């Protein structure tokens, strides 16, 4: 150890199959510098699954974790079959029962997804995310079968299956890899048409040695592509959560990012391959052959040992491990230097800004300009009242500053409650599609009111029954019910 406090892992990417049934030409696993997949077992052996589950349980117990997330990944995880995935889920539940909450997700290309898989995932409460790059034209630029056939119809069928009332609660979202040759607004529209609970828009993995495709003379076309979607998303009243934009907004307000591609939060994720070896993030496969390797495995090493690896330690030190250029940047708290893999350059390794530096700067500044009430609102991550103001108010001697702090805190809370109901309701399985559509329409009214007459909106949100209604709705949603049907 280097004297730092070890930050435990709470997310584990468990590779259950190392091969794939598609041949996507932008895949970082098969088309990148690291080719370690060639020497690994296709399906995870039972001994590896059992030992991985035990190691995760040991780590949870040692660090008294209240929750761990396991993502079943590949390759294509559904190639492991229903029986193979069930065996892995049994091992995970057995090892973690009584220790902490276990959240399991699976990320799939969707082409094999059917009712039998969904019934298994329903039985074990497994969330399902699917990769789709847009409409048929956009998706089929890269996501094809080996013989060149389109994968779109099979993936669309899988998404419709997940969107049905029976399995809607399993649907965790869609993941889209950006290609600037595709029309951004059309991509956004085609994804939103599936009514996913959330979207993720990913920059294609690239490095300074292997930069992303760009039109000659354009330094920020990825930012421009994302900005077109952000502006449409905002104009639509934020009908779906988009992780990239949510993370920028949250980090601008002083919070944490929901993605390793942004922000300064320490990495808390470990990959476990089908042969039981521990690896760092899969994205590092684009840097050089062996880049994600740790030299450690589940049979010999604890997860604490993995977290002591220099590559992981570097991503737990925040701003201290960024390049000098990044440390001087005004948006470093939000950008965080970009994804670690995207900083790689031969000779200087990862001590560089992201190969998407100009794009990230432009995108973050655009979001900040469109949401001025968010920018610099660091109070979201701290107490609404300073200690001095709290003491003054408690003693009955609070002055204008203390009262102002209290007023701002109450205003923030009033505004946050409807947003919390909206976000929870969109993803709740008990909320039928017509009700979600009404929620979107109501949210659009709030967004327009906030833009046109924020004072009037504050008056509405200050109604004495708003808090009671919102708390009641959140309680119903957390118990698996619909939002309050009696609310007008």
Predicted regions and their residues:
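N-terminal [4Fe-4S]-dependent radical SAM core
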Residues: 1-13, 63, 431-434, 438, ...
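Accessory C-terminal segments flanking Radical SAM cores
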Residues: 245-358, 362
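Radical SAM/AdoMet-radical enzyme domain recognition
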Residues: 49, 53-71, 80-204
């Amino acid at each position: 150890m280097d004297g730092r406090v070890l930050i435990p892992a709470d997310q584990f990417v468990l590779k259950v199959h190392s091969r794939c049934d598609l041949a996507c030409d932008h895949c970082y696993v098969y088309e990148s510098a690291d080719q370690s997949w060639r020497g690994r077992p296709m399906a995870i052996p039972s001994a590896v699954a059992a030992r991985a589950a035990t190691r995760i349980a040991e780590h949870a117990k040692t660090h008294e974790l209240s929750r761990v997330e396991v993502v079943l990944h590949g390759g294509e995880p559904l190639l492991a079959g229903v029986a193979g995935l069930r065996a892995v889920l049994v091992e995970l539940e057995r090892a973690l029962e009584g220790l902490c909450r276990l959240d399991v997700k699976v990320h799939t290309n969707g082409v094999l997804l059917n009712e039998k898989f969904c019934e298994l995932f329903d039985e074990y409460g497994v969330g399902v995310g699917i990769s789709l790059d847009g409409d048929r034209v956009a998706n089929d630029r890269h996501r094809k079968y080996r013989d060149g056939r389109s994968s779109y119809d099979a993936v669309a069928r899988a998404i419709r299956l997940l969107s049905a009332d029976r399995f809607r609660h399993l649907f965790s979202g869609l993941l889209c890899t950006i290609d600037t040759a595709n029309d951004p607004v059309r991509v956004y529209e085609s994804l939103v048409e599936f009514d996913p609970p959330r979207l993720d828009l990913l920059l294609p993995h690239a490095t300074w040695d292997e930069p992303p495709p760009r039109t000659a003379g354009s330094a920020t076309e990825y930012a421009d592509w994302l900005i077109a979607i952000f502006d449409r998303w905002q104009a639509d009243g934020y009908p779906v959560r988009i992780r990239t934009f949510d993370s920028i907004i949250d980090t601008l307000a002083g919070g944490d990012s929901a993605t390793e591609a942004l922000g300064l939060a320490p990495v808390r994720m470990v990959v476990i391959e089908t042969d039981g070896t521990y690896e760092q993030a899969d994205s590092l496969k684009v840097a050089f052959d062996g880049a994600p390797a740790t030299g450690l495995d589940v049979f010999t090493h604890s997860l604490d040992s993995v977290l002591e690896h220099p590559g992981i330690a570097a991503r737990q030190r925040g701003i201290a491990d960024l390049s000098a250029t990044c440390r001087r940047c005004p948006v470093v708290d939000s950008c965080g230097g970009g994804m670690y893999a995207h900083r790689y350059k031969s000779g200087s390794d990862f001590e560089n800004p992201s190969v998407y530096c100009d794009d990230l700067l432009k995108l973050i500044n655009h979001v900040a300009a469109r949401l001025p009430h968010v920018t610099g609102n660091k109070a979201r991550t701290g107490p609404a009242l300073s200690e001095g103001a709290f003491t003054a108010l408690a003693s009955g001697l609070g002055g204008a500053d203390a009262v102002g702090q209290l007023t701002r805190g109450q205003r923030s809370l009033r505004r946050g409650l409807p947003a919390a109901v909206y976000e929870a309701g969109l993803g709740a399985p008990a909320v039928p599609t017509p009700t979600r559509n009404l929620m979107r329409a109501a949210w659009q009214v709030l967004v327009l009111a906030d833009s046109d007459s924020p004072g009037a909106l504050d008056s509405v949100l200050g109604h004495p029954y708003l808090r009671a209604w919102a708390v009641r709705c959140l309680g119903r949603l957390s118990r698996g019910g619909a939002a309050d049907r009696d609310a007008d």
